[in-house]
Amino acid sequence: MADLELLCIDLQNDFATEGGKCYTYRPSVDFVKNTFIPYVEESGIGINEIVSDYRQPRPGDDRDCCRPGEWGFESLIPLERRKGKQWIKTMNSPIWTRAGAGIPMDNPGLPFQDPVSFGNWLLKQIGGREDVGSVVVFGLTADCCVLAGVQELKWRGYEVSVLSEATDVRSGDQEEKKRFLSGPPFTFWGKAISFEELRKKIGSGR
């Protein structure tokens, strides 16, 4: 059994880098780039990754961003640290995908739910709930796509934590993040873990 697996959600240029279509400054991005990624590179740890394809059409959300083949779609996670194949979602919840997800094309399909394929991706990437001690999630944003991912993992029986320094709420406000990670609804499905706690967990026998 693996002690833990890392899962990054939506750390893409359109969300995380100045000039992105949906960019807001969030301190966690600096932490990931300057502290966390160098740490996992030194430790040789792979990162599982979920990214978004938010091209139109997407009923209920008129944003048009994270377009495959464009800069805004690209992830901040270095290719050499990425573990296996990315899962590409089309809504907040990772069970939503589309025909042509991640493929540069003019007419991508409408979003649809595919929980079976998402579950198969999880099994291939991190194993079943009995194969991994915990899944540590980070990325953007804690109160939207990260929360939706945490819920989906918890409902499938995984133990889930969120790396507090490596996520932010949509506004980027640190007091709001602290409140969000310390109580409901977040604590119904996951718990916050600090970078120091994660380092100790990895050091004690990943």
Where are these regions (language model features)?
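Active-site-adjacent betaalpha module
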Residues: 2-5, 12-14, 31-34, 38-43, ...
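A broad, low-specificity signal for short, low-complexity segments enriched in glycine/proline
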Residues: 8-10, 49
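Active-site micro-motifs of SAM-dependent methyltransferase domains
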Residues: 13, 17, 56
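Acidic/histidine-rich helix-loop elements
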Residues: 16-27
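Von Willebrand factor
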Residues: 37-56
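A short acidic, glycine/proline-enriched capping/turn motif at secondary-structure boundaries
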Residues: 54-57, 92-94
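Metal-dependent catalytic neighborhoods of phosphoester/phosphodiester hydrolases
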Residues: 58-63
